[in-house]
Curated annotation (Swiss-Prot):
GO biological process: one example: translation
Protein family per UniProt: Belongs to the eukaryotic ribosomal protein eL34 family.
This protein's UniProt keywords: Ribonucleoprotein, Ribosomal protein
Leader sequence segment: none
Source superkingdom: Archaea
HAMAP family: Ribosomal_eL34
Source species taxonomy: Archaea, Methanobacteriati, Methanobacteriota, Methanomada group, Methanococci
Gene that encodes it: rpl34e
Protein name: Large ribosomal subunit protein eL34
Naturally occurring in which organism (per UniProt): Methanocaldococcus jannaschii (strain ATCC 43067 / DSM 2661 / JAL-1 / JCM 10045 / NBRC 100440) (Methanococcus jannaschii)
Molecular function via GO: structural constituent of ribosome
GO cellular component annotations of the record: ribonucleoprotein complex; ribosome
InterPro entries: Ribosomal_eL34, Ribosomal_eL34_C_sf, Ribosomal_eL34_CS, Ribosomal_L34e_arc-type
Amino acid sequence: MPAPRYRSRSYRRIYRRTPGGRIVIHYKRRKPGKPKCAICGAELHGVPRGRPVEIRKLPKSQRRPERPYGGYLCPRCLKRLMIQKARNL
């Protein structure tokens, strides 16, 4: 029986064949869901999908787009927001 921490489905079960021919189970943390736009809910491109520890290892330029609200709003919603802010000035 697996250790208690591995009994939940928080971990993915990956079946691997060892060099000796046995099948063993490796437990891996699941990837988080894809990042979504805060306004329309569309999937954000250019933002990696990984656990925080994996994303922390990436260079800053690969973590999210380098524009205002990058990694938070999609380009379409950002365009609308900028136009709206300019009109309210």
